[in-house]
Amino acid sequence: MKNIRNIAVIAHVDHGKTTLVDGLLSQSGTFSEREKVDERVMDSNDLEKERGITILSKNTAIYYKDTKINIIDTPGHADFGGEVERVLKMVDGVLLLVDAQEGVMPQTKFVVKKALSFGICPIVVVNKIDKPAAEPDRVVDEVFDLFVAMGASDKQLDFPVVYAAARDGYAMKSLDDEKKNLEPLFETILEHVPSPSGSVDEPLQMQIFTLDYDNYVGKIGIARVFNGSVKKNESVLLMKSDGSKENGRITKLIGFLGLARTEIENAYAGDIVALAGFNAMDVGDSVVDPTNPMPLDPMHLEEPTMSVYFAVNDSPLAGLEGKHVTANKLKDRLLKEMQTNIAMKCEEMGEGKFKVSGRGELQITILAENLRREGFEFSISRPEVIIKEENGVKCEPFEHLVIDTPQDFSGAIIERLGKRKAEMKAMNPMSDGYTRLEFEIPARGLIGYRSEFLTDTKGEGVMNHSFLEFRPFSGSVESRKNGALISMENGEATAFSLFNIQERGALFINPQTKVYVGMVIGEHSRDNDLDVNPIKSKHLTNMRASGSDDAIKLTPPRTMVLERALEWIEEDEILEVTPLNLRIRKKILDPNMRKRAKK
C-alpha cells in the first residue's frame, strides 16, 4: 500500500503533458535499453498524433525506487472535460503543468477548480523553461493568484514547484540547480503525493472511471480498488449508479506497466486495474463484495451542450465512395461509440437519422473524422446548442472565452464578438505586444466564429473556451453574412465556367469536380444565394484570335476541412461526408422547390 502513488497530469492543450509522461516513462527505466520509444507515445490514436492533442485519458504505470507510480494522462480540451473530472476521483495527487511563457490558460482553470474542490494538493510543474521568452517567476505568481481566486486552503497554497523542460528531459527544484534529469520530479512526487487511503482487510470496493472495448472480451472497465482485494474468477456484485444490481464473475484482471497491459491474478486497495466480465458496466458503477455490499458515490457527469444530426447520405452521388452506407451500419457504429464515449449521447430519430449530442464542436468533428476514415458515408447537419428549461425559463449554455491577440486586432475582435452577444469581462496587456481579452458568450455565438477569428487576426491569435453554465436565452445571434453559390446542373465543372463564376465570390471546387443540382460550390460575395451553372463549356467558332483562348486564370479554391465546413453551413444546408470528399449541399436540392419552401 505505502508503495503506490496515483497521480494525474493536468495541463492546457499543448503545454507538454504527453511529452512529460514520455520522459517519465523512459527515465524510470520502464523501457529496456533496446526498445525504441515513439514520440508522444501516449497519444495512441492517429487523430491524436496528427493534431497533437490527447482525447481520451490514458493510464500507465512506472516503478521508481520500489514505488509504483500510476500516471493518468488527461485531455486538456474543455470538450473532453467530462473525462478529466472522473480521473480526479481516482488519484491522490496532481501534476499541474504550466507553460513558462503562456502561463495559466482557461482550460487549466476548469480542471484546477475541480482538483482543489476534491481537496487534492497539486504539484506545480513549470514546463518549457528553455523557451527564450519564458518567465517562470511570473507564472508561479499567476498560479498562486489563481489558487487564491478558486478558494484554495492554506495547505494547497503551499504547493511545491518543479521547473522542467520535458522535451529535453530535465527538471530542477530551483532555477539555479544543475540540468541533469527528471529525478527532482520523481522525488517531489514521492514526497508530496500521499499514498492511497483504504485498507486491504476491508470488504471489496472498486469504482469504474473509464471504459475500453475489446473485440474478444467485450466491455472492459478501468477501475481503482478503494478497499479490499480482488482476484481473477472471483464472484462479485456490480452496483449500477441507478441502484440496480448484477451478480457476476471477474473473467479478466489486467494490470498496467509502461505501455504494456499484462494479465494479473490479484489486485489490492490502491491499485488501478482493468477488469472484464460484465457487459452492463458503466462509468461510476461500483464493484463490491456480494456478502457485504457497500457502493461508492456514483459520479456526476456534465451535460452535453451541443447536438448535430447524423443521417444516411441521400445525395445524387451517394454510395459511390464509401464502404458503409446503410442506416443499420451507421446505427451500429454510433451505438458502439456510445459504449466507451461517456460524454456523448445518441438518439434514433427514424428514417436513418440520429441525433448525437456532445460537449462541443471538437468532440463531434473528431467522431465524424473517425467514421470517415473507417469508410462510412453520411451527412451531418449544422451544430445546434441544447436549450434547457429551468423553472419555465429557456436557458442556453454559456462559455468563458479567452483570446490572446496582437494589440492591433483587438478592436475588430471586440466589435465582432459584440454582434455575437459576447460580454467583455477583462482586457490585460501581455508581453510581446499581445493583449489578453476575456469574454462570456453564448455557445451559439461561438459556432462558426473560429474561421472569422483567424482571418481577423491574420492567423496570429489564439482562442480558448470552456463551459461556464446555463443562463437565460439571450436572443438571436448573427450568423453567416454571405450567401452560397449553388450549382443548377449535374455534371463535371469546367474551367471556362468557373472562370466566369469566380468574380461572384470564393469557390470551393476545382475544375473537373463532379457537381449536382443543389450542391454548394462556393460562397457568394453578397448576402443572397445564387444559382450558377458550373458545367458550361466554351462554344467553338471559326474565328480565332491568337493567344486569347488560353487566358483563363483561376484563383485556387478555398479548401474546406471538416470543422470549417461544419461552422460554415446554415440551417438549410447539410454537409455530405465520404472517405474521399466533403461536399456542402442544400437540404432541398431542386431550386424551384427551394424557392417555394422559403415563401
From Swiss-Prot:
Enzyme class: hydrolase
Name used for this protein in its record: Large ribosomal subunit assembly factor BipA
Keywords noted in UniProt: Cytoplasm, GTP-binding, Hydrolase, Nucleotide-binding, Ribosome biogenesis, RNA-binding, rRNA-binding, tRNA-binding
Record's catalysed reaction(s): GTP + H2O = GDP + phosphate + H(+)
Binding partners and assembly: Monomer.
Location in or out of the cell: Cytoplasm
Pfam families xref list: BipA_C, EFG_C, GTP_EFTU, GTP_EFTU_D2
Gene: bipA
Keyword Nucleotide-binding attached: yes
GO biological process assignments: ribosomal large subunit assembly
Enzyme nomenclature, EC number: 3.6.5.-
Domain tr-type G, residue spans: 2-197
Biological function: A 50S ribosomal subunit assembly protein with GTPase activity, required for 50S subunit assembly at low temperatures, may also play a role in translation. Binds GTP and analogs. Binds the 70S ribosome between the 30S and 50S subunits, in a similar position as ribosome-bound EF-G; it contacts a number of ribosomal proteins, both rRNAs and the A-site tRNA.
An annotated GO cellular component: ribonucleoprotein complex
Main location: cytoplasm
SUPFAM superfamilies: EF-G C-terminal domain-like, P-loop containing nucleoside triphosphate hydrolases, Translation proteins
